[in-house]
Amino acid sequence: MSFEITVGSADDVQRMASWANDEGWNPGNTDDHAFFAADPGAFLIGRLDGEPQACISVVKYGTGFGFLGFYIARPPVRGKGYGIQVWQAGMARLAGRNVGLDGVVAQQGNYKKSGFRLAWNNIRHEGAPPAGKPPAGVTFADARSIGFDRLAAYDRKFFPEARDSFLATWISLPERASLVALRDGEIVGFAVMRACAAASRVGPLYGATPEIASALVGALATTLGATAVAIDVPDRNKPAVKLAEQIGLKPSFETARMYTGADPDVDYAGLFGVTSLELG
């Protein structure tokens, strides 16, 4: 049998998202377009006799950071060594970088053996949030309506490197809505909600205060008509966990954020929900 690892096409990335949905990860309906825009060479497919059977994404950000996701071997080929070959090819692409990932519970021990260490846990909370309106002195605007450079600079406070190609696509795809919170002309919050096969996902979710973050979630749910939402909440930000509970969301799924190097220097206090488990 012949096993070959190649760089995936846009269609392959769509297939990877479908596999992720089979695993219960509930990616957004159109996420694959933004994923491919982030780094078109990042998506590796392992083909057994020409048939796709395993995958990994290894996105390069800037010069020093990378994020690993979509590490999947299809059930019929698990335990046969194909997944680890894809893993090794992916890690080779990110050699010399601080690499992050969000690992499912069953794989965390293996990731530690590969040099990753636990930074925090992302706890997915799901439920029906109350309607939200901006706190006093704060207004909401469509994130596409402000200068993109301003939005990208704000996003950079919470992410280790610039990700302009990804971000520009992330806010403009169909089946989603994005809002910024403004106070005295300054951005004090930003959130995106996208439709998924199950609960609509929120990410990123940034806010100068829990009240701003909460209101963004409620406003986005109203805009999209979402009856159920899901947020991957970093448990290192205790007010974020408390906020998810206060708006009626319940824990449903857990991953570990792990890095090969130091925790990135970002504004964790304003990070109420990570963007995606696949690309960070």
Protein language model features and the residues they cover:
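Intrinsically disordered, low-complexity, positively biased terminal segments
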Residues: S2, S9-Q14, A34, R47-L48, ...
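Glycine/alanine-rich phosphate-binding loops at beta-alpha junctions
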Residues: F3-S57
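Hydrophobic alpha-helical segments and helix pairs
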Residues: V86-G137
